[in-house]
Amino acid sequence: SPRLRQAIASYLREYRGMEVPAERIVIAAGSQTLYQLIVQLLGRERTFATECPGYPLLGRIYGAQNVHCASIPLSAGGIDIAALRESGASVAHVMPAHQFPTGIVMSAACRRDLLNWSRTDAARAFSAAGPRGRFIVEDDYDAEFRMSGRPIAPLSSVDVAGRVIYLNSFTKSLGAAFRIAYMALPEELAAQFELNLGFYSNTVSPLEQLALARFIEQGHYERHVNRLRTHAKQLQDGLVRRVRESSLAEEVAFEGLDRG
């Protein structure tokens, strides 16, 4: 609904530093539906790069859409940019804020190199036949649950060339039964989506959309996330304390405790 898109746009502006007009937000019943729409939007003739290790079903979902997938290894700072270049992929699906399952936070250098990779041929990236050039699918998985420090700014907030598709879902924060996800499209991709895919009916219940819009508008969602984050931090602190007080203290090392 327009009201939910506006609520999400306001949330992204306030908490993720993203300036995205509501009309460039697409809502769907879960992230997997969005992955399928991205393939239809960008085209099946592309190679999609996915992180390895990564979300186990992602390659299968893209493969079911008849696109070729390239599995790209991770370095300490995120996706291996050299391997990405060598793969011939024109779409990179990444989780910069909190990579699953490793928990890696993409480094500033890797973010810069990834954005530079995507900008190659950006000046001629669109045609009457559809979008060309390279794109990044930024899956902002788990970004709300960073335990300490400043939130990790999304790639989308510094994307000046219109190469980043931003994805997020409410499933992690509101429960697996709450199947609402969304993506924020760059301006020209949003126009392509409206032209070629705008006929799709939204599969999310209007009642659920209205309820979520009000939940966000009234500040309940942010307070809910803060409570979850506080509870998770208490559980984490308790686990770490017990391990450090146990006979395992010399055998176990913790890292990335701020990542969620």
Where are these regions (language model features)?
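Conserved glycine-rich beta-strand-loop-beta hairpin in the small C-terminal domain of fold type I
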Residues: G54, R229-V240, E251-G260
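Conserved core segment of the aminotransferase class I/II
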Residues: V160-T230
